[in-house]
Amino acid sequence: MDHPTESGAQVRVTFTTQEEDIQLDESKRQLLVPADIRRYGLSRILNSESMLDTNSIPFDFLVNGSFLRGSLEEYLNANGLSLETNITLQYVRSLIPPTYEASFEHDDWVSAVDVLSATSPAGRWSGDNFQRGQDRILSASYDGLLRIWDASGNVIGTSPSGSHGGHTASIKAAKFLSSTQIASAGMDRTVRVWKYTESGESYERRGELKPTLELYGHTSSIDSLEVDGASKRILTASADGSIGFWTTSKASAPEVSDSSLLPGAHTSKRRKLATSVTAAQRGPLALMNIHNAPATAAVFDPRDRTVAYSVSQDHTVKTIDLTTSSVVSTFTTSHALLSLAALPRSSASAPLLACGTSARHITLVDPRTSTAATSVMTLRGHANKVVSLAANPENEYSLVSGSHDGTCRIWDLRSVRPATKDEGGMGSVSEPVYVIDRESQQGKKKKSSVTGDGCKVFSVVWDQLGIFSGGEDKKVQINKGRGVNAE
């Protein structure tokens, strides 16, 4: 077989893309190019006046599902292909490596992070009530407090302590419901809904978090919380193995059915008076005991809010019909599942479910397939548990993960390869395109043999403002990059 090693060799390529705004005319899609050309040269060809005639858009190129990392010549040699091979190149806008932007200091571990912006879910749910330019970051900490930050790293508001209506133990999860409402949950087994208001001039804003609703039903720590501001609904996953379904409406929320769960049930009268608050106390719309081990995450279907998905340390992924509080399907995986994200797909009615595992990888599951099916893809690269996941808000094919190995990793599902024999030999595998390390560990000597010890990532969220992560280093870290998010 001939190999393209001779000087001046050329290869015929066919350019394709799935991005409508950068489609080539059909007459321009096939071209002869030098065999030794690389990504940069191909990108220049596409941007040229005779092709797309664009302002230097950086492109990456996929060949058979994998990114082209060398020259076309090297690709042909590696795959035993001759010069006569017509190579189909799918071109996509490049992701630029995310750069470190800032860190916000805390007094204790940061367990959860969320963002309020014009493009975030809560920003959209707020409608006209959200003021553009007043982006906010929400953090939850093991010290039992919520904090609201402005984009400059100033704390605008802090939740009250446990004796004044706040959480009485570490907070594990928190989300914006809107620009004026927040939900949080944690180790005190409660979900708390807060009214958030701001006052003062733009250069000296002050925020107030006032507890308005306490939700009781779980009998153990609540480790995950998901919200839908449009329907005023909340999903929770608890170490008691159950999934909670709640409303933020006091009028439609049922009374607490088990009075022993209320804070005053085992407290002296003097203690009750000292900690009494005016927040209403309500129970769940449904409490579904569907897992045989701690439930670790639950999310709404991106398109159908009457459907939810949950994962657990019992190795299962469950599809839930929220109208009947029943399990529709169960998928059993090989490992304990610790995190979950639903990735919308324009070509399918159901999302792709990304499940972070205790085995250091991410399993992608299609909930439409049979209960006997295994994962459709595996994302490998982390060196410790994967405890947080977030989809890219701008496309369907990338996500970010947070791990106890002290990193966040960005994945592109268009870049895949067959699994090797050591990886089980079945399905497809993808590897991270970028790794975000903790800035707090730069220049520090490693003190422990445990990967990620002292800098575990507990939470990550992806917004057009950037990638925000919080963890064991007591910081919220912000990373930005063109293509990864808006500049």
UniProtKB/Swiss-Prot annotation:
Classification via Pfam families: NLE, WD40
Bilayer-crossing regions: none
Localization (cell): Nucleus, Nucleolus; Nucleus, Nucleoplasm
Sequence segments annotated as region (Ubiquitin-like (UBL) domain): 11-93
WD repeat residues: 120-159, 166-204, 217-256, 290-330, 381-421, 452-487
PROSITE patterns attached to this UniProt entry: WD_REPEATS_1, WD_REPEATS_2, WD_REPEATS_REGION
Keyword Membrane: no
Main location: nucleus
InterPro entries hit by this protein: G-protein_beta_WD-40_rep (IPR020472), NLE (IPR012972), WD40/YVTN_repeat-like_dom_sf (IPR015943), WD40_repeat_CS (IPR019775), WD40_repeat_dom_sf (IPR036322), WD40_rpt (IPR001680), WDR12/Ytm1 (IPR028599)
MF GO annotations: ribonucleoprotein complex binding
Keyword line: Nucleus, Repeat, Ribosome biogenesis, rRNA processing, WD repeat
Superkingdom per UniProt: Eukaryota
Listed GO biological process terms: chromosome organization; maturation of 5.8S rRNA from tricistronic rRNA transcript (SSU-rRNA, 5.8S rRNA, LSU-rRNA); maturation of LSU-rRNA from tricistronic rRNA transcript (SSU-rRNA, 5.8S rRNA, LSU-rRNA); protein-RNA complex remodeling; ribosomal large subunit biogenesis
Its job: Component of the NOP7 complex, which is required for maturation of the 25S and 5.8S ribosomal RNAs and formation of the 60S ribosome.
Family: Belongs to the WD repeat WDR12/YTM1 family.
Assembly and binders: Component of the NOP7 complex, composed of erb1, nop7 and ytm1. The complex is held together by erb1, which interacts with nop7 via its N-terminal domain and with ytm1 via a high-affinity interaction between the seven-bladed beta-propeller domains of the 2 proteins. The NOP7 complex associates with the 66S pre-ribosome. Interacts (via UBL domain) with rbg-35/mdn1 (via VWFA/MIDAS domain).
Protein name as it appears in the record: Ribosome biogenesis protein ytm1
Originating species: Neurospora crassa (strain ATCC 24698 / 74-OR23-1A / CBS 708.71 / DSM 1257 / FGSC 987)
Name of the gene encoding the protein in the UniProt record: ytm1
